[in-house]
Amino acid sequence: MKAYNKLSAVLLLSAGAFCHQALADNAVFTSMDDPSTAKKPFEGSAAAGYLAQTGNTTSSSLTAQTNMTWYQSSMAYSLWGNAANTSSNDERSSETYNIGGRSRYNLNSYDYLFGQASWLSDRFNGYDSRDVLTAGYGRQILNGPVHSLRAEFGPGVRYDDYHAGGHQTKALGYGAVSYQWQLTDTTKFVQGVSVLSSFGEDTTVNSETGLQVAINSHFALKLAYNVSWNNHPAESAPERTDTKTSVMLSYAM
């Protein structure tokens, strides 16, 4: 049994997905969607990670995500989605679904306009649904083969449907920074941070730190650490900070 538990731990670290808590709001768009540097009209990826443990404790965790971007001469359109759930002793302990869409229009080599919409369901953190719509201006600060950096901001609106009952609509300010560093031909570092704030009692900060290591031309190992902080969380899930660590196998379309 001890040997089996050690093997389970190794499998957990090498091929699984695990989390401290489900994220209440984890939509951070980190893909560099600049149409001026696109090498092909479509880029996409799908990734998944799974963990299962049996014995004295029975648990499972599944994480899956996809991201797709279509390019034109000065426009880019993106769709993304992710799902994660965790069960322990045949009881569901977290369940999160998130989908979103985005468009970008380049005004010139550095300036662009964007629009972005997302939907989140995370009942274990108090939300049957959370809908966010934002639009605004962005600046492509770096766009080289090694370093890519963009910053964007604009107004937004969010609709929250609480799992415990009730709903609320808020006007928000949105800001985000996304950075990519091509460390080697096969290794890429990604960092993204977004902020949604009502400039009062409700502010949400999302962060994603990732490392992607290519196995071959199609498959890669993707490691990610997500943090979500909300200074005014739902009453049914009072923790302000949620984290998620994942290890996934990614396939490039």
Regions found by a protein language model. Give the residues of each.
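Solvent-exposed loop/turn segments connecting transmembrane beta-strands
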Residues: 52-60, 88-94, 121-129, 163-169, ...
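Transmembrane beta-strand segments of Gram-negative outer membrane beta-barrel proteins
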Residues: 36-52, 74-79
